[in-house]
Amino acid sequence: MHSSYSLSKCLVCFTILAIQTLIRRVSSLNRTNAYLNHKCLVIQGKYKRQSEYEENLNYIIDHISSTQKFPDGFTHTSRGEAPNFVTIVFQCRGDSYGSKCRSCYATPISGIRRRCQGYKGAIIWDQCFLDISTINSPPTMIDYENTFSMHNQNNVNEDAESFNKKTRDFLYNLMLKADKPKAGSYAAGEMRLGTKNLYAMVQCALDIFECKVCLEWSINELSKCCHSKKGARFLGTSCNIRYELYPFLST
């Protein structure tokens, strides 16, 4: 009787522990993939309902949804002539191509319509990135304006200078990998830091020519804003970088 009771008690404890672990994993995934930031491009003005601009916008949104399979996680589509010209740039994180990217598409679309209702131009960042604009910038131009940073509130406990140098060097190595012709402007990896692992990724929009220049600038900006932080990211419309002390990419 005693051994049967002990076994049942162990099974209950194991079940509770498994559920708690699952909840933590789901919560972590939700935090990783959740809405990050948005920007309504007020300077580009607003459009009226049932206008030619709205017609062009809705056409592109529906066209991408019905035709794109996102094999490389990216699309840049335009329609119309000024003042009703619309261009959409959509890109998924480098670990979310194909069907994962396709399922991600609806989230920023609904988010941008809710947060920037009626604005001709808007940008939203979550696991996917969406940029709607009336301006078709040439791919040689890096957008240094529409950027932001986020970081863990806690600092590392170990030698901060050593941590910063190793993190910076690791991001530079990933930058060089992402800049290679067949890399798809994306690289990710992990490295050992004492008793912990450091996880990082770098990614450029597929339509910019100078990926290395953009990433190098972003790494420098990250060093200014997020010195000694346990995790941080710097995001823009041309490229983005991130590092954490826990795995955050899909496998």
From Swiss-Prot:
Q: Where is the signal peptide?
A: 1-28
Annotated keywords: Repeat, Secreted, Signal
A GO CC annotation recorded here is: extracellular region
> Which Gene3D superfamilies does this UniProt record tie to the protein?
Gnk2 domain, C-X8-C-X2-C motif
> Where is the protein found, in the record's own terms?
Secreted
Query: Where would I find the Gnk2-homologous domain in this sequence?
Result: 35-139, 144-248
The record's family statement is: Belongs to the cysteine-rich repeat secretory protein family.
Q: What is this protein called?
A: Putative cysteine-rich repeat secretory protein 36
List the top taxonomic levels of the source: Eukaryota, Viridiplantae, Streptophyta, Embryophyta, Tracheophyta
Gene symbol here is CRRSP36
